[in-house]
C-alpha cells in the first residue's frame, strides 16, 4: 500500500484545524491544618456552606465554617492520609443524596451509598440534604390519622399525618419498639417509612432490619444508618439525609413516616464538630444553634395543602433522657419544637406495664383532630381517668379508707391499665382497638379478675371475627360507632356470659 506524502499532510492539517484547547478552571485550596476529622483549608474564597470538597484519595469533606481567611471543613471518611499542604478541590455541589423509589427496601449510609450488599442504588435524582421547610402557605392542618397499632398511643395520644410526635425516655424503656411497631403497622397501607439510625451499634441496626424484613415491612421502608463507629459528620447529616429522601415522596403527594433514632446522639455529634471547629460552647457545652439544628430538621415534617399534592411527612423523633430528667437542655428543646410527646417511664417498664407510657405528661397537641371518630367516642376520657387513677393508686397505698366511688375508679383503672398492655411487634388494627377499649370503658371488665383481662380481650376479638365480622368491618370502613353501638353492647354481654362460664367465674 502506497501512502503519498501530500495525503498525510492534508490529514494532519485537518486534525490541526479541528484542535481546540479546552481550558478547565478548578477552584483549589490548600490544607493548612488537619486533625480529629477537621481540616482547615486556605484559598477557596467562593466556597458555599455545606458544599462538598474533594480531598486527595477521593475522600469528601463538607464546608461548615466559612471564615475570613480559611474554611473549617469536616471530613466524611478516613483522614489519616491527608496532610498539611495537600490540595483540596471544590465540587460545586451541596451535600446531596439519591432519592426516589429505587431506595425503598435498601439500607444506605447518610450519603446514599448502599450498606446491604445488594448493589448500587439505581437513582438518577438527587436532593440537597439541607432545604428550607415548606412555609405556612404550603401547609394544611393535620386531619388524617396515622395508626401506630399501639392501643395506648392510638387511644390517648393519637398521631396525625404530618405531625411531629416526640418519643422520649431513659435507655432500654421501649422507645425504638414503639417506632418499629408503628412502621410494621403501615403494612398494606399507602405510607412509605424511613428509619434513620443515628449513633447506634451495628448489631442493633441489624436486629431492626431483620425484624422489618421478617414482618414484610422492608417492602415499603428505607433504612439510613450512621452507626456509632462512623465519623461524627455522618451522624450529624443522617437525619437531614432521611428528611430529603422523605420530602421527595411528600412532594409527589405520597405519605411518609420518618423515625429519627435518636436525636440526642445527633446533638452530641454536632457538639463534637462545633467544639473542634472552635465555635463558642453554650449550655451543657452544646453550641448556641443546637435548637436551630433540630427545629430546621423537624419543621420539614408537615401536611401539604391539596394544591401542592396533599402529601405528608410524619416525624417520630426519639430522645434519650438521663435518669428521667425531661428538663435537660436537648429534651426541653425538642419538646418545644414538636406537636406532643410520648414519655416512657422506667418504673412502669419494670412493673411490667409495657408500653411504659406515663399518660400524665404524654400529650398529642394536634392529633385529636385526626383521631378516628369511633376511637374518640370510646376513649374520650381514658387519658384523664388513667392519670387520676395513678394519683389515687399512690394515695391508696397508705391504707386510707376509700369511698365506693374511689374504689370503683381504682378497680376500673386496674383493668384499663391491664387492657392497654401490648406485646412487641403485634400492632392491632384500629377496629379491634375500638372494640377492646369499648368493653373496658363501658365497665364490662370491672367484675373480672385483673389476670383475666388480656385472655378476655384475645378471646373476645376472636369471637367478634367469627360471629360478628360486620361490626369490625363497619368501624373500619366508616370510622364511626353509632350504627353498630347497640349491637356491640349486646355482643360483649353475650360473650362475657360465655367467658365467665368457661373460666368458672360465675
From Swiss-Prot:
Membrane topology type: Peripheral membrane protein
Enzymatic class: translocase
Site entry (Required for activity), positions: 362
Keyword Lyase: no
Catalytic activity, reaction form: ATP + H2O + 4 H(+)(in) = ADP + phosphate + 5 H(+)(out)
Annotated Gene Ontology cellular component terms: plasma membrane; proton-transporting ATP synthase complex
UniProt KW keywords: ATP synthesis, ATP-binding, Cell membrane, CF(1), Hydrogen ion transport, Ion transport, Membrane, Nucleotide-binding, Translocase, Transport
Residues annotated for ATP binding in this entry: 169-176
EC number assigned by the record: 7.1.2.2
Molecular function via GO: ADP binding; ATP binding; proton-transporting ATP synthase activity, rotational mechanism
Location of this chain's protein in the cell: Cell membrane
A Pfam cross-reference name: ATP-synt_ab
Major location (coarse): membrane
Domain of life: Bacteria
UniProt subunit comment: F-type ATPases have 2 components, CF(1) - the catalytic core - and CF(0) - the membrane proton channel. CF(1) has five subunits: alpha(3), beta(3), gamma(1), delta(1), epsilon(1). CF(0) has three main subunits: a(1), b(2) and c(9-12). The alpha and beta chains form an alternating ring which encloses part of the gamma chain. CF(1) is attached to CF(0) by a central stalk formed by the gamma and epsilon chains, while a peripheral stalk is formed by the delta and b chains.
HAMAP family referenced in this protein's UniProt entry, alphabetically: ATP_synth_alpha_bact (MF_01346)
Family: Belongs to the ATPase alpha/beta chains family.
Entry function: Produces ATP from ADP in the presence of a proton gradient across the membrane. The alpha chain is a regulatory subunit.
Protein name, UniProt field: ATP synthase subunit alpha
Organism this protein belongs to: Pelotomaculum thermopropionicum (strain DSM 13744 / JCM 10971 / SI)
